[in-house]
Amino acid sequence: MRTPQGQQRLPSDWQGAFKLLLAYQRNQTPGKLETIPHGDTQVDIYDPLSEPRSTVIFVPGLAIRGREDPRIRRLGWALCATGLRVLIPDVPSIRALTISTRQPDEVATLLKSLAGDRTLVTTDDIVLMSVSFSSIFVLRAALDKALADRVNTLGLIGGYFDIEKVAD
């Protein structure tokens, strides 16, 4: 895309993606990180320096370090650097490396609880993201009427496709 002066300009979607990748690569930590209790779990909140454009709720995959995994923290900061408020909760059973048929409901209940708390989700729309094992649960929760109208974007990285096989 070219501007009237002949300079090349990236569409805003590409600018956002570029900014995210650059922030991730540089391991930038703009804004503020706070950990708060929420129900029976902990939630990391990454607040950008300016008014957030949207709120991301990111559910970690099956990993013992959960929200404290350095890769997850780095992604939280990178998303924050693009002007997003980021919430990263621990899902107790997933962090404990347990697999059960109760997890889809556990994740959905947690997401609805977070999204319904206006002190945590300060924007009208939300972005739901997840990686690996938790992605199928986040996808299922996004279809719930309590969340569907507010979900603007889904970002699922390396998720499983068969919830029945995952939960067996």
Q: How does the language model describe each region?
A:
Residues 62, 85, 90-94, 160:
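Short beta-to-alpha linker loops that shape the active-site pocket of alpha/beta-hydrolase fold enzymes
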Residues 3-54:
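N-terminal cap/lid segment of alpha/beta-hydrolase-fold proteins
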Residues 53-61:
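Short beta-strand element of the alpha/beta-hydrolase
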Residues 130-140:
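Glycine-rich nucleophile elbow surrounding the catalytic serine of serine-hydrolase chemistry
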Residues 98-120:
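Alpha/beta-hydrolase active-site loop
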Residues 140-168:
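Alpha/beta-hydrolase-fold enzymes
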Residues 70-87:
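Short amphipathic alpha-helix adjacent to the substrate-entry channel of hydrolases
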